[in-house]
Amino acid sequence: MFKKIMIIITVLCMSASVACAQGKKNPVVEMETSLGKVKIELFEKEAPISVKNFLDYANSGFFSDTIFHRVIPGFMIQGGGFTADRKQKPTKAPIKNEAANGLKNDRGTISMARTSAPDSATAQFFINVVNNEMLNRPNPDGAGYAVFGKVVEGMDVVDKIVSVKTQNVNMVFQNMPVQPVFIKSVKVLK
């Protein structure tokens, strides 16, 4: 009898933990920009390192008053690292590239920006405005670009941002908006 009760309790506990794991929702953040709000679901299961990194920066207020410094129609909008006076904000150590997570750089996805070194991403990110298949394939450096979330509300705002007039300021700031587009805040909703 005791053995049957233990089996039943074990099965119930396992069922409850599976149900809890399945019921866990992905975090959602609201990015308030000077052109409107964008809600982004973050894919914690597929990109745990990138999501934790992004949430750490968001929760610390790091993204507040940064700009979208690279805006390219037919490609993407990039931000999260510079102030309006083109000063780069100090970041934490780079993270491991999670591009092999199975997620694709499709329209509306958010990915980690990086240099030509695969594991060089810190705070900067980009939102794809079209399907960017070439970013999924390993580049000459051996890696693609890590998707870690998707816009779930406010893609019209992203489209507004990508349509602003841009300029080439210098070799570092190519395709920079003439009038800065600010990230006012990034708040975790759930």
PLM segments and residue spans:
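Cyclophilin-like peptidyl-prolyl cis-trans isomerases
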Residues: 2-9, 13, 19-190
